[in-house]
Amino acid sequence: MKNILILLWKPLSKHKIEILEIESLKKFYKVNFCEITKIIFPKYKKTTSRLNFKVTKIQNFKALIHFFNKNSFDLILNHTGIQKNTEVYKLLLRQETPILTSYENFISKNLFYPYKFLSLFKNFIFSVIFFFLKKKKLNEYSYLMSDKIENIKNVIGTNIIYGQNYAINEISKIKNKKKIIKNKVVFLDQNWGDNTDYDLYYDRKSINRFKKIFYKELILFLKKFEKEFNAKITVSLHPFSKKKNWIKYKDFNISINKTTSEIASSNLTIGLWSNSLSYAILLKKNILIINSKSFLNMTDEYNYANYVTRYINSSMPLSISESNSLHKDTISKFIIKPNNKYTTYKNFFLQAKNSKSIGLCSAIRNILSKNKTL
């Protein structure tokens, strides 16, 4: 049985295990997990997983060298997001083992004026280089979930596999099989402020101040929404949300690790900025994107909400900072109904143009069987 290493930058949730098709991989290969969080992000606190499989946690670069000296693998799935010019990636190359890196396309300010023109120019230059580059690096593979990835220079010279976002695979399993529940609305929790990712970029004291204000606004808004629309809200919890934090949603139905099916059976999805919005777009659901003035100090979150809204609709997100003044007519104006931009979003972010609907598991099997048809 061939040996696969999945290299991680942070713990995997149960949901992530499913979308990476790891259970399918285990049917064919011995799957190993190595987490290098402390090397990439020394400040990152959460380095444990709730899952019941063994994860080797590497604390420093020397330990990583020792790990590779002791172990050999038939393929390395690079799920870290590290750049190709880093020492870690150079170490991977020295293993003389096929390396498969998956790339997604994330929404950013580079999609809008004036940043868009610089981004397009850079991508054009790298695309020309990519087109004329004849020599391929035999052991480097790039799985593209979109052919418009922002850092196209990372895939130059590698063997390209045009694939699709895991969200498409998930949707294909449930589409047309879920009965829509009348007045059901799903809110996408992102574990804001409690997710340890925030500690990488922001001061914890500032986070705690913002968090207190934001959740007060959020709960008030969700209750207001239920009353105005005679709706029943289900909160789809972030996979790493701790039980002690669930109490803030005690007045609502809660669900965890079932985001796709919850959205499929709902009429409307509410969120700020979440990758899970992709499911709502693919399922052509009504979407309400919210924002809060308390996010002004968390600029990435505040801007992401604006970016998503601008890409699938021309209006801005609904500010929930003054929920008392919000009524059904006002809120309804911000609800985005399925439109042509949903398809544009799918083509831009969720599926490579030349995709053959190859999932990540199939891509790995083809590489290891030396299939040349990719």
What is each residue range found by the language model?
Residues 1-114, 194, 198-219, 373-374:
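N-terminal pre-catalytic "stem/leader" segment of glycosyltransferase-like enzymes
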Residues 55-64, 165-168, 234-283, 287:
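Donor nucleotide-activated moiety binding/catalytic core segment of transferases
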Residues 69, 137, 261-262:
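Structural alpha-helical scaffold elements that stabilize or flank donor/cofactor-binding regions
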Residues 72, 140, 264-265:
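Alpha-helix C-terminal capping/helix-to-coil transition sites in glycosyltransferase folds
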